[in-house]
Amino acid sequence: MRLSALLALASKATSSPFYRYGMSRPGSIADKRKNPPWSRRRPVVVEPISDEDWHLFCGDMVEILEGKDAGKQGKVVQVVRQRNWVVLEGLNTHYRYIGRTKDHRGTMIASEAPLLHHQVKLVDPVDRKPTEIQWRFTEAGERVRVSTRSGRIIPKPEFPRADGIVPETWTDGPKDTSVEDALERTYVPRLKTLEEDVMEAMGIQETRRFKKVYWY
């Protein structure tokens, strides 16, 4: 694991109470355009689901239950936990124009619209049909998803992150900081100042005598 990933996990992002999550990555140009600092957008009511109960991840094969693409199966390519959204590759699409100017109508592209978590279901790998799941523990203590109909374990898929890295298959390179080195405690707190530490390390003896200073 890279040191930047560890620092990202340690950081805590804070957002405005009027901030509204969307399809764009938080902090991107498109997100800043939709959420300017002066905007006061009405908050969106979202069904609270804990991280322990959430069971849809990028790379999962699911089937759509509602909408124009009901009955079709596709792969989850994006999950927006703050809105309970999932985006399927090539499904539930709508068409829009980009690059529109005064003299050019723009280019029409297909864009996937998000679906709520209750509008899709995981596909059972045994019969390729939608199924309910339960979280259970294996004999080794691993928490897995189990189909309630067939009892088959549905493993979490290995899906690359935004930078193209699959954490489960990543191997550290010569320029990567290992987890052991990043977590190693090398700093020893001391009451001395930086100047006193440098003088002690270099063997510098202070021979000057400072005059008294009075504070009024």
From Swiss-Prot:
Q: Which GO MF terms does the UniProt record name?
A: RNA binding; structural constituent of ribosome
Q: Which GO terms describe its biological process?
A: mitochondrial translation
Phosphoserine is found on S24
Superkingdom per UniProt: Eukaryota
Q: Give every KOW domain span.
A: 56-89
Q: Which UniProt keywords apply?
A: Mitochondrion, Phosphoprotein, Ribonucleoprotein, Ribosomal protein, Transit peptide
Q: Supply the SUPFAM superfamilies for this chain.
A: Translation proteins SH3-like domain (SSF50104)
Assembly and oligomerization: Component of the mitochondrial ribosome large subunit (39S) which comprises a 16S rRNA and about 50 distinct proteins.
Which HAMAP family does the record match to this protein?
Answer: Ribosomal_uL24_B (MF_01326_B)
Q: What is this protein called?
A: Large ribosomal subunit protein uL24m
Organism listed in the record: Mus musculus (Mouse)
